[in-house]
């Protein structure tokens, strides 16, 4: 299973970005940031791996924020593998 998490330094920016994506028709969830990522406020926005281009466009429109990065999360044999993309 693979998915993306979008990490921010601020919980309020995480919630604002989640609301922004939802208002623009993209299914998203607020999740705990995987500890393996070692970044952020503890919460991230989870989106489908197939939503990368939409997510990047949304980030460019979202404006000034505490955005840290987009991470690909792969779950293999119960372990999470995190890569910055």
Regions found by a protein language model. Give the residues of each.
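Absolute protein N-terminus
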Residues: 1-2, 85
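C-terminal structural segments of small proteins and small subunits
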Residues: 53-85
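Amphipathic, hydrophobic secondary-structure cores in small proteins
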Residues: 2-5, 9-11, 17-18, 22, ...
